[in-house]
Curated annotation (Swiss-Prot):
InterPro entries: BCCT_CS, BCCT_transptr
Activity regulation (record text): The choline uptake activity is completely inhibited by the protonophore carbonyl cyanide 4-(trifluoromethoxy)phenylhydrazone (FCCP).
Chief place of localization: membrane
Organism of origin: Escherichia coli (strain K12)
Pathway(s) annotated for this protein in UniProt: Amine and polyamine biosynthesis; betaine biosynthesis via choline pathway
Catalytic activity entry: choline(in) + H(+)(in) = choline(out) + H(+)(out)
Presence of the UniProt keyword Cell membrane in the record: yes
Disulphide bridges: none
Protein name as catalogued: High-affinity choline transport protein
Transmembrane feature ranges: 15-35, 54-74, 94-114, 144-164, 196-216, 233-253, 265-285, 319-339, 350-370, 412-432, 452-472, 477-497
Induction: By osmotic stress. Choline is required for full expression.
Bilayer topology term: Multi-pass membrane protein
Amino acid sequence: MTDLSHSREKDKINPVVFYTSAGLILLFSLTTILFRDFSALWIGRTLDWVSKTFGWYYLLAATLYIVFVVCIACSRFGSVKLGPEQSKPEFSLLSWAAMLFAAGIGIDLMFFSVAEPVTQYMQPPEGAGQTIEAARQAMVWTLFHYGLTGWSMYALMGMALGYFSYRYNLPLTIRSALYPIFGKRINGPIGHSVDIAAVIGTIFGIATTLGIGVVQLNYGLSVLFDIPDSMAAKAALIALSVIIATISVTSGVDKGIRVLSELNVALALGLILFVLFMGDTSFLLNALVLNVGDYVNRFMGMTLNSFAFDRPVEWMNNWTLFFWAWWVAWSPFVGLFLARISRGRTIRQFVLGTLIIPFTFTLLWLSVFGNSALYEIIHGGAAFAEEAMVHPERGFYSLLAQYPAFTFSASVATITGLLFYVTSADSGALVLGNFTSQLKDINSDAPGWLRVFWSVAIGLLTLGMLMTNGISALQNTTVIMGLPFSFVIFFVMAGLYKSLKVEDYRRESANRDTAPRPLGLQDRLSWKKRLSRLMNYPGTRYTKQMMETVCYPAMEEVAQELRLRGAYVELKSLPPEEGQQLGHLDLLVHMGEEQNFVYQIWPQQYSVPGFTYRARSGKSTYYRLETFLLEGSQGNDLMDYSKEQVITDILDQYERHLNFIHLHREAPGHSVMFPDA
């Protein structure tokens, strides 16, 4: 079924969203570069205010996000598809799982997989450091910050974007999820504000990741090639990301970028296996099991632990508040990616896959590298601990230096980090371009020049933050800039829930019997005629004749009668899509602010079953004339129907639609408005 909201217009920017967000970000970037001391002071004071005023809110919000996602997946809404009912997943289960697996990998994992466990072990938020309990607590906090809570934010945004875009053909933007609440007002200031908040939050999240990546890579290159660990080298790495994005746009190597992303998975797994078998394998496997048990046992208590009576303010700002804001900032970016690869899957499949598969990888990575780092410290690595705390970007390489073949492993780590870095920068520019564009359909991407612009903007912002106060500035601004979008996510939750409730009314209306009708002569087919219909496998010519002489006249009669009764009706015979031989018929009845009635007839091509005589005679395919409503295929075949029977089917579906509208209007809080079909 085609996108009913498809526009023939050329892709163009959304001027309000683009100029506002671009202006604010460029102004902020230049301010941090030109007025470093002032920027550092302002960021510090703002962070203190946000932490004191909204620290509790970040903890509560993160908890509500994961509760909402799990409840939706486990409820009856879990069977709703991200797309029309007849849609099938674009990717096999294995390919989809591999892409989810890759989504769990990033250069920040290399940075924090050693730095956080070591810091939490040496300076825990509560209790004494450098104890067995501190070691267990250190790994649980690390897993907690990279765990299910964060992935639930990605799942929430991906679920909302996929549902509204692929099921209701709305643009693949954040404002689409707010349509059930604000209706057509999302095309005005409300929608613009939401998209601006998404763009600003996303670019700061990406800049934080790239800033961490720049610092990490600069040190790796200095270890391998004696390249100075300097701001000039960091600026060169930032320039590299801009160049890669430009090449990706101008030479069409997007597919190559995706191949590099897949290569990252293999290299990352190789690093895990290297450390696992070069280290104390038995200890690491035992520690992995212990970490899982501790994570499960302590998860609920940690989720809402605000340390109210003895609050470690600096620790909260640097860790839990930073991570939750970081996940929030990245949620539009990753949510968009997850939505694009998950069309045709049910909400339950999507949520389970998104929560379990990527976290499985992060669990393995963090457990192997984190426990290896703690093992080194416990067995006399005091100098290693000090270096990992004071210079966290060195921790990962310092750990690899404890094993044989350091040059080789450090080279693999640097290549892996570099690939993560350039692919994240390129993908980030693409997503920001899409969020600031008016795309003609949900499968379109932003113009190339816009992607280059956002790549430059990301680079400037990253450079400005690093020049102001290094990684600390990036972390602090993420906590600040992630706050507005965290409020937007609650509106997304409300819009998604209200729209899913509509699915209940639709199902109930479909289950209600339509008015009984007497069987006519055409209904009482002889058994021979019925058998002939069942054994018929029509080709292109017969199907086209059926559409022109029976289906279209039937739809035209219904349309004329509805117009006589005051309805605004559109009837179209649309040309074949690319690669198809037959077009389709489209009947649209406008219903004001209620959901429009859509009735389409599509010729669907299938392979002839092998047990039939036709298959043995050489005919390989046949057509079914299937009916489609807005929510998808109805699964029936109109082939060999009479005109009266087609009219009856249209009226049956129209009556069900009116029942659905009646049920929806009777429901409490039925303010959900619908997009034009």
